[in-house]
Amino acid sequence: GKEFVGAVWPGKVHFPDVLDREARKWFGSKYKFLLDQGIEGFWNDMNEPAIFYSEKNLNKVMKEIKAIKNDNMDMWEVFAFKDLVSGLANNPEDYKSFYHTVDGETVRHDKVHNLYGYGMTRAAGEAFEELAPEKRILMFSRSSYIGMHRYGGIWMGDNKSWWSHLLLNLKMLPSLNMCGFLYTGADLGGFGADVTEDLLLRWMALGIFTPLMRNHSALGTRDQECYRFTKTETFRSLIGIRYGLMPYLYSEFMKAALEDKMLFLPLAFVYTEDSHAREVED
């Protein structure tokens, strides 16, 4: 019966029960202030929901830290201490500690975890239809579930600056299309780790064709704006190609949306009789 207290970027917060219709309506109404400022694009982030720590678990960890404050910790105790602190974020026990109201029934969060991002984005999408019915508002989310493509797009979350994640990006595009998500894209260059110039160039070249083309990286990683590298003219050329292809890309996107088709198809979907095409994933 108590309010669950967790922490994200602003510090301690409460999480709206976006699985409840009235709560969704309340949450969606908060977009009005932003729309009134002329904002027409939204990025719903941290909506798994991510939890940096909960008040309950933080108190527990602080108590254990005080207990070992004056100890002469050996190697194993140091490792245990590190695990104690790192275990604060997104702790599975926290997701078992708060509840939702679904069709009049009380449901523990971890049982419906993947629906939270869906509910948040649905709240926003329904609000946009009411607050700005004449506009085509851009919105994409990090967390989601099947069916959320009715309200917005999805980006692929926190990847790494690895060549293997560039390949993963290629595989995820048709996979997400098959789930209904046409508006999607990755953090070009990778979100975590330090990108190389060659990797960023290759990733930007792929990004030319994805609906969301965004270079995005984490705090504490190498600055990866295009102008920070030596081949600035090559980067400029890639971005120019993107703008030059916009009419074509927009037309192909709308055809896929209106005709219930995929924007990115595996080779096997095109060459159905070619056995080799079924094995190609890059």
Which residue ranges define each predicted feature?
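Catalytic-domain carbohydrate-binding cleft regions of carbohydrate-active enzymes
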Residues: G1-D282
